């Protein structure tokens, strides 16, 4: 799977787990709605660590927790 697909799947999964909307994440993280939408819709070509960190803060998790997923297991990303 490509990296942007893995990021999208994980973000959507976490939003579902937290019963949070993209708008709520925007208000909690400060990451623009368009950036969140781009990630969710796999329209991003690159997401920097600062954005991921801010999203994680909005979700109430660490970067480690974000990447603690089979989507990011060794050999899964073919980007």
Residue map of PLM features:
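Short, basic-rich loop-to-helix N-cap that marks the start of a DNA-contacting helix
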Residues: 43-54
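The DNA-recognition helices of helix-turn-helix-type DNA-binding domains
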Residues: 32, 43, 70-74
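A short, Lys/Arg-rich alpha-helix, primarily the initiator
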Residues: 1-20
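Residues within the helices of the helix-turn-helix
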Residues: 12, 23, 53
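The alpha-helix within a helix-turn-helix
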Residues: 15, 26, 56
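Short alpha-helical DNA-recognition segment
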Residues: 19-38
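Short, charged recognition helix plus adjacent turn
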Residues: 13, 38, 67-79
């Amino acid at each position: 799977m490509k990296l942007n697909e893995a990021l999208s799947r994980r973000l959507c999964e976490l939003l579902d787990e937290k019963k949070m909307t993209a708008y709520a994440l925007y208000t909690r993280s400060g990451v623009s709605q368009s950036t969140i939408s781009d990630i969710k819709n796999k329209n991003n070509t690159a997401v920097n660590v600062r954005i991921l960190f801010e999203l994680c803060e909005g979700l109430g998790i660490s970067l480690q927790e974000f990447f603690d997923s089979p989507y990011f297991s060794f050999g899964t990303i073919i980007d």
